[in-house]
Amino acid sequence: MKFLLLVLAALGFLTQVIPASAGGSKCVSNTPAYCRTYCHWGETALFMFNASRKCCISYSFLPKPDLPQLIGNHWQSRRNTQRKDKKQQTTVTS
């Protein structure tokens, strides 16, 4: 009984001392990024944590790029200008 209690105490202590290697540690406290040797599928490296480890973050947590907003129907207006250019070319050449 004493041996079983000693084994359980040792296992409880070891789980506190040995870090979990599968999950990785957090790189920065306010981002959902983890310090790993290799990034998982669906992740990208933000920066190198040290010489052999990267700070990996999921693509879903990356900020979306700001794209310019098109006003109105851009493709329709472009098509009309192309038609006008063709009409002007035919009238000039004939």
Curated annotation (Swiss-Prot):
GO biological process, one term: defense response to bacterium
InterPro entries with a match to the protein in the record: Beta_defensin_dom
GO cellular component: extracellular space; sperm head
Lineage top rank: taxon: Eukaryota
Similarity comment: Belongs to the beta-defensin family.
Disulfide feature: 27-55, 39-56
Function: Has antibacterial activity.
Disulfide bond is among the record's keywords: yes
Comp. bias (Basic residues): 76-86
Cellular localisation: Secreted
Chain spans, region Disordered: 72-94
Keywords for the protein's UniProt record, in alphabetical order: Antibiotic, Antimicrobial, Defensin, Disulfide bond, Secreted, Signal
Protein name per Swiss-Prot or TrEMBL: Beta-defensin 132
Leader sequence residues: 1-22
Entry keyword annotation includes DNA-binding: no
